[in-house]
Design a protein with these regions (language model features):
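Active-site-adjacent loops and short helices of periplasmic peptidoglycan-processing enzymes
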Residues: 26-171
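Extracytoplasmic
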Residues: 172-177
Length: 177
């Protein structure tokens, strides 16, 4: 009968072989659009339809985080700055935290709730707190996207809820990531 350490070793070998087979498959991942980039060098390892436009959905919140943390870095706000849930933020579709209008949260907590729960209301709270309005914040998002070289991206809201004109590509998201 095999010992526990022997079984554990066999499982490790089986896992390693499985990972190696997946890694060596020419098309290990399938998607309408994909771009696999080596983080340290920027070398493209695999690309399929990397420049076709597509709807960004909740990955929009990565740019919301980027713009908010840039404002912190520039000293315009701090992570302890209080922001208020507006009626517009409170009315966002789920996923959301569901705070009542008038509730105050810190930038830090709003960021955490937005990123962990994908809270659409917190994305709007951050947009209004940093950019003054959804439109003002969307302009900041687009300015930053252009500055980063994201030439196929246009943002119209901070949370990724369906909106005409909100578009990106796998290539542009790789730049942001």
């Amino acid at each position: 009968m095999p010992t526990v350490s022997c079984v554990s070793s066999l499982k490790s070998v089986a896992f390693a072989v499985g990972v190696a087979v997946i890694a060596l498959s020419p098309l290990a991942a399938r998607a309408e659009a994909l771009l696999v980039v080596e983080a340290d060098t920027g070398k493209v390892l695999q690309a399929e339809n990397a420049t076709i436009p597509w709807y960004p959905a909740s990955v929009t919140k990565l740019m919301t985080t980027y713009v908010t943390l840039k404002a912190v870095k520039e000293g315009r706000i701090t992570l302890d700055t209080l922001v208020t849930v507006s009626p517009i933020a409170a009315a966002q579709s789920p996923s959301k935290m569901g705070f009542r209008s008038g509730t105050q949260v810190t930038i830090d907590n709003a960021l955490k709730m937005m990123m962990v729960k994908s809270a659409n209301d917190m994305a709007v709270v951050l947009a209004e707190g940093v950019g003054g309005s959804i439109d003002g914040f969307s302009a900041l998002m687009n300015e930053n996207a252009a500055r980063l070289g994201m030439t196929q991206t246009s943002y119209v809201n901070p949370n990724g809820l369906p909106a005409e004109g909100q578009i990106t590509s796998a290539r542009d998201l790789a730049i942001l990531a």
